[in-house]
């Protein structure tokens, strides 16, 4: 938000202000094209913003390195470079907006008001409207309704379960009813998992669609791209979510393999209780552990590639429109 505001401050009077001071006509009296002059103003604003941000990043990086919170590496350097590149994109977007307001306004006072209106709409209103957009345009089922469906699925399974499916005798693991109980518990677990996983997927789609709408703002695009650059945020969450589902299968496979080796177990897998599976302890070091794997550059870039293209298109479209207007601009 601050970067976007600073970029607008550097450009809102770049044309209208110079027109008022009569320096714009003087500049164009030299052998320099309007496109070159406009692009020079645009580029100087972006570089100025990047210089300010780079100084802050450098100070923060030095503090982190001195305190030992991180060590310098190629990966860290790449993340810093990616962050600065994304910052340059959002600065370019709002610099283009600032030049646009400066070209269409008759004087610098009006261009300032127009630039502030653009900043409030694209920098504040749209990014903070995500909750309204999600609830209004992409509503999903409430958690209470999901729980009711889970309870209904449990009731249906219980009604159709064979007699004895709830019998249990912890002293006799080979009790025949334990197999029925294990089958029922497995079905209950799978039914709940299917319902909740489907609900979570609708939540993911709601979030993604809402973010697509709020991506009309370069500030939202900046957030999405910086998350990808740092390997954090929603991109990281989805990767961990998918990896945890893989780990679930690995852990279950480990337990079943452990159970098969126990001759005192009837091998009736019960996900809730150990009445019909092995009760022998397992060595801690043999249990599969979940470890978060670092995201590769491709894994970070792939989910946000469209966002990156949209941001670049944003900058080009606004600047091109500004250029067309500036070519016809009366500098007198």
What function would you assign to each model-found segment?
Residues 1, 109-332:
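Transmembrane alpha-helical segments and their membrane-interface loop/helix boundaries
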Residues 1-17, 21:
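Long, hydrophobic alpha-helical segments
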Residues 4, 17, 51-52, 89-90, ...:
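Alpha-helical transmembrane segments of multi-pass membrane transport proteins
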Residues 5-9, 48, 78-83, 303-307:
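Short alpha-helical transmembrane interface motifs in multi-pass membrane proteins
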Residues 7-11, 96-97, 113, 322:
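Hydrophobic/aromatic residues in alpha-helical transmembrane segments
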Residues 26-34:
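Short helix-to-coil transition segments within interhelical loops
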Residues 35-41, 326:
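Alpha-helix N-cap/helix-start motif at helix boundaries, enriched for small hydrophobics
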Residues 40-103, 143-169, 293:
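Secretory targeting signals
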């Amino acid at each position: 938000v601050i970067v976007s505001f600073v970029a607008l401050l550097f450009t809102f009077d770049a044309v209208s202000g110079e027109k008022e001071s009569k320096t714009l006509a003087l500049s164009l009296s030299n052998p320099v094209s309007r496109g070159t002059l406009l692009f020079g103003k645009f580029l100087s604003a972006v570089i100025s913003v990047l210089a300010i941000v780079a100084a802050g990043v450098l100070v923060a990086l030095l503090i982190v390195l001195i305190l030992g919170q991180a060590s310098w590496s190629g990966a860290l350097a790449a993340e810093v470079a990616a962050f600065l590149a994304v910052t340059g994109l959002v600065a370019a977007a709002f610099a283009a907006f600032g030049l646009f307001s400066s070209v269409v306004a008759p004087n610098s006072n009006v261009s300032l008001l127009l630039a502030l209106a653009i900043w409030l709409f694209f920098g504040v209103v749209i990014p903070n409207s995500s909750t309204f957009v999600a609830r209004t345009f992409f509503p999903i089922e409430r958690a209470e309704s999901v729980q009711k469906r889970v309870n209904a699925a449990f009731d249906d399974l219980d009604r159709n379960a064979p007699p004895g499916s709830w019998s249990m005798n912890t002293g006799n693991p080979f009790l025949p009813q334990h197999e029925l109980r294990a089958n029922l518990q497995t079905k209950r677990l799978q039914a709940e998992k299917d319902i909740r996983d489907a609900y979570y997927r609708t939540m993911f789609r709601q979030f993604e669609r809402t973010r697509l709408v709020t991506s009309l703002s370069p500030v939202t695009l900046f957030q999405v791209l910086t998350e990808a650059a740092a390997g954090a945020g929603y991109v990281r969450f989805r990767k961990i979510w998918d990896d945890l589902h893989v780990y679930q299968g690995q852990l279950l496979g480990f337990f079943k393999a452990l159970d098969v080796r126990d001759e005192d177990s009837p091998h009736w897998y019960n996900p809730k209780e150990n009445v019909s599976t092995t009760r022998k302890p397992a060595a801690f070091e043999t249990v599969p552990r979940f470890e978060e794997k670092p995201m590769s550059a491709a894994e970070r870039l792939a989910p946000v590639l469209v966002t990156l293209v949209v941001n670049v298109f944003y900058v080009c479209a606004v600047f091109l429109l500004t250029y067309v207007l500036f070519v016809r601009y009366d500098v007198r």
